[in-house]
Amino acid sequence: MRRLSSILLGLLIFFVSCQKNKHEIGKPAIDQDQLLNGITTDTFDLITYTINEDSAITDNMANVLLGSYVDPKFGKVSAEFYTEFRLKSLNPVFGDVGTIVYDSCVLALQYVGYYGDLSAQNFEVYELNDSLSMDTVYYDFSTKPVKPGNLVVNGMGTITPKPLTNTVVNGDTLAPQLRIPLDTNFAKGILEESTSGNGTFASNVNFQTFFKGFKVKVNNPSQVIGKGGIFYFNINNNAASKLTIYYTQSGVKKSYDIVMNSLAADFVHIDTDQSGTPLEMVLQDSTKGQSTFYAQAFRQRAVIKIPGLDNLPKNVVIHRADLTLPVQFQNGYRYKPGSAVSVAARLKTSDTRLSNLNVVGAFVDSKKHFAIDLRTYAQALVADNIDNTGVVVSPVFFRNSAERIVFNGPNTINKMKPKLILTYTTY
């Protein structure tokens, strides 16, 4: 797996989910002398299971997702995206388009990361038959109709992604790109439109009425369990991600770019098939989550309830509340648990939405667990500021990645079990 950059982590940590409210519970100061004399207990019973996420907003995210993989625990996951294009400049001059020889047409997408392996996938591109809008909210289940016919050059859609290898274009070495070759007849139609007299290239509104954009997807019906990956591309703020028409005119090699940027609408569509998987069994019977429970970007969140926190006396000061969540992962396995998780809760039993607790649990690779500081959460429970509805844990890039996590439950057959260690004093 290739994680998103640390810079992107900083930017995205505030956008963990479209359905979380931010809530500052409060941060009582730690008195080190009291900490040394405090009472420590780790005998809390935990109730663990998995819940489904109804939907996630996916329009104009920091990166789009593309690809598929088949996970032995989660089933098949597929990601595709829809995007508009914009003119790089208005009223371009192509001269006599009748003299143009169309050499190639390439959709270039610059990688910013990936999840899974680098086996070959079959990529397809379709022209949209309906416009996108920056004013519309799009979800992971949203779709748009397309025109018939895959635009990828016949026989050239099967591509082995190389997100770790620089791309060379016309002798220039560039950051890694996925380059999808498209039918030059499509390119011809774009440039010939400049002579139509319709003013297509006079404004982006006119151009987007003529060319509404692309749906970019994969088609991997024979992908087997444990194979595949989903790739992350920056199309909103990256000049390298674009559609380029390469042509020759009067013996001179030329090119014309049509761009994607933050002013062009886009969204990601996600499909999952959990049929017959261990995840499906936990979703159907939450008690099975006591052995193993799960979290998956866009789709599922992990729940940890700690009923024993209700039994704490009201005259306690919580000094530490360390929740550790061991995961099932072996070094070298392609589907890693990610670098961090976000933590949320329903602050009142009547709440229908999650509130972000402003807590990020880091993955401790040497111990194969996530470490989560629940001190402020536990103190808020003691003070009766919130209800004990449990905490909800998700991949920190819930709307920007394909990450998934397999957690050990309290009844796991594995050695490491989830545990809350609480240190407190009374007054």
Short names for language-model regions:
Residues R2-L8, L12-Y427:
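Secreted, disulfide-rich extracellular signaling modules
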